[in-house]
Each structure stands twice: as C-alpha cells, then as structure tokens.
Amino acid sequence: LNVPYFHLVFTLPHDLNPICLQHPRIMYSLLFRTAWQTVKTFASEPKFLGAKTGMTAVLHTWGQNLSLHPHVHCIVPGGGLTAGGKWKTTRSDGKYLFPKSAMRIVFRGKFMAALKDLAKSKTIVLPNELKKKLYRKQWVVYAKRPFAKPENVIECVSCFGHRQKRPAVSLLALSPAFTGGTRKHVGHLVFGDGVF
C-alpha cells in the first residue's frame, strides 16, 4: 500500500532465555501474539488511530553475536480501516507510530499475564523471584522512525534475512516459516483479528 510504514521491535528480557530454550514454540508464539495484541490495542485507541491496522512480523531468536536474543521485528502501516471500511491515517507526529514508553508497559503486562496463565496451567515453571524480577524490568520496545517511502519496506524485510540461505523476501509470498544459515526466522502476516 502507498502509505507510511513504521518499524517496531519487541524484545524479551534475557531472564526468559532458559524458558525460551525449554519451550521455544510456546514462548515465540506468545511473543508474536503479545506484540500483535500491543499494536492492536494502541491502534484501536481513538487518540492514536481508532482503526484496525495490520502487521508483518519476523522472529529473530539470535542477536548479532549469535547469543540467544528473542525479538520480533514488526512492520506496521501508518493507518488502518475504520468500522465503516474507510482508510484512516495515523495521528502520529511523524516520528513514531505509538508512544514507546506506553508500549513497553502494555507489552510487558500482556506477556506477563499470558506467562502467568501458562504457569498456572503447569505448562511452564515460573518461579516467584523470576516473576518479580520481570515486573521490575523495563522491557524493550524499539520504535524506528517511519520508512521514507513504501518501497523501503521491501529493503527492510530483506535485511531481516541477512546471511540466510533463503532470502527473507520469501515472506512476501506468505511463506509460513523458513530456516536457513545459523538463525531461525518465522514470519506471519496478520490483518485485523488474524490468528497466528
């Protein structure tokens, strides 16, 4: 779409690495889901957008130094569809889609609520000390300024697969998952109330 796009990155605290190693499918699915819920929550607020938006997300499980560093890169259009089906552009000041500090708090709250539910159902073990530590931490939600033009989104998505055997551009074909090289990436395209 010929609209502005924003780049968001949601990162899990390293304190969760042991649980990510024990339950990668559960934890990474939860990361996608809560990142999307956070974006959807802010987009639905009239003071920010008041519309249904979309999101393309790519999981990176490793950092540049190849240490475990789970985070999702998200490309979010600078607008969405109103209840009447009309396109509405974001009220952003042009720097960031939504306030970073508020997104951090909402993301942490949504992730922790889901994590506690998993612990309650005995799907994972979440010690009380770890839970307290996670609530005290300032979680990382990184927001980049919007792309200069929509064509830059393709360049950005291709960078997500840097040094991969298969290019990340395969996400444009809605490939549900791919692996290559030393890192694993899983992509999802979500619009409206899509399910991961």
PLM region descriptions:
Residues 1-196:
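Beta->alpha loop/short-helix hinge microenvironment recognizer with preference
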